[in-house]
């Protein structure tokens, strides 16, 4: 095989992989509801506004889990690991009688 052919094949493979990843990312994102227009009946507008409210709630929802309580974790780390007591302070080994 020629080196030029291999490099082109690698570039095409990378582009296909990037397009597949981009497609998978966009499918996971919720679809924005279609606006029925200003002259739509009241029932369709109510459905649209309900769907829009649901869409906005999905986009801006709180994320629960590890990211929701960093302050508590910071205080636990500082209290448990960084707490200075007389036991954790290094003791001097200097003994004047040895000199």
From Swiss-Prot:
Pfam families: Hormone_3
MF terms in GO: neuropeptide hormone activity; neuropeptide Y receptor binding
Main location (coarse class): secreted
Modified residues (Tyrosine amide): 64
Position of the signal peptide: 1-28
BP GO terms, sorted: feeding behavior; neuropeptide signaling pathway; regulation of blood pressure
Gene Ontology CC annotation, any one: extracellular space
Tissue expr: Expressed by the venom gland. Heavily expressed in the venom gland transcriptome.
Keyword Aminoacyl-tRNA synthetase: no
Record's keyword terms, sorted: Amidation, Cleavage on pair of basic residues, Hypotensive agent, Neuropeptide, Secreted, Signal
Location(s) in or outside the cell: Secreted
Task of the protein: Neuropeptides Y are crucial for the regulation of cardiovascular processes such as blood pressure. Venom of Meiacanthus fangblennies shows a potent hypotensive bioactivity (tested on M.grammistes), but has no effect on the heart rate. Therefore, finding a neuropeptide Y sequence in M.atrodorsalis venom suggests that this protein act as a hypotensive agent.
Identification of the protein by name: Pro-neuropeptide Y
């Amino acid at each position: 095989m020629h080196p030029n052919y291999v490099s082109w094949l690698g570039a095409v493979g990378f582009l296909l992989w990037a397009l597949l990843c981009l497609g998978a990312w966009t499918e996971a994102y919720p679809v924005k509801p279609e606006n029925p227009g200003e002259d739509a009946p009241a029932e369709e507008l109510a459905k649209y506004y309900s769907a829009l409210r649901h869409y906005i709630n999905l986009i801006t929802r709180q994320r629960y889990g590890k990211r929701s309580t960093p302050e508590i974790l910071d205080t636990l780390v500082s209290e448990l690991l960084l707490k200075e007591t007389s036991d954790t302070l290094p003791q001097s080994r200097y003994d004047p009688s040895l000199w």
